[in-house]
Amino acid sequence: SVPYLFNGYYYWSRYEKGYEHPLYLRKKENSEQEEIILDGQKMSEDFEFFNIGDYDVSNDNNIMAYSLDTLSRRIYQIKIKDLISDKLYPETLENTTGSIVFANDNETIFYGKKDPVTLRSFQIYSHKLGTNQSEDVLIFQEDDETFSCYAYKTKSNEYIVINSSSTLSDEYRLIPAGNPLKKPEIFQKRERGLEYNIYHHQDQFYILTNKNHHNFSVETCSKDSTGKENWKEFISGREDVLIEGLDVFDHY
């Protein structure tokens, strides 16, 4: 894969000749010394099926959480690794969606769980490193069976976001990444037919939405007033152009 820079390290994956599973590597920004953080080929040796789903690294660069599917059902275990000692934490998180997000305290991770029957992603939990999964806190449960939910961190590194989506509706909740114990706050309540995605940048959010145009427009709002009544048009919708996505950068 193409290396990407995160918090002073480049991260990428690579297949060695004859390998069925990749190596996951990193190196410091100004160094040529590679560090193998996961050896997929070696890890797969005891399993008939093996797939690494997702991984995330703590803000201090010292801890890695990663997910594994060894059942071929997209039901993942999450394991946590100390990248300094190369040793695993004692706990394993079972029956997850495979998605992982570190809070900025370097000791809390957010992850999703699936409905055991439908395999719909419907719960978001928080886990404190070094504790049993039975002690994890249910942060959000999506009871509407037409919606699925997942958690991620904004590109700004400032918010944990819980997204609930169906075919024609979206709803987001925000948790400050530096305060993972805070109750999630709704960005804009779900409405049938209202689709939107959010992108945080400095003191505001950019919103890609079909609120004012079926081909979507880009709106902005203050991070302190996020309801749709506060959205202001930034890029108008057009009949001849469908806006499919956007990204934000510090210097562009």
State the predicted function of each range.
Residues S1-Y252:
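Beta-propeller folds
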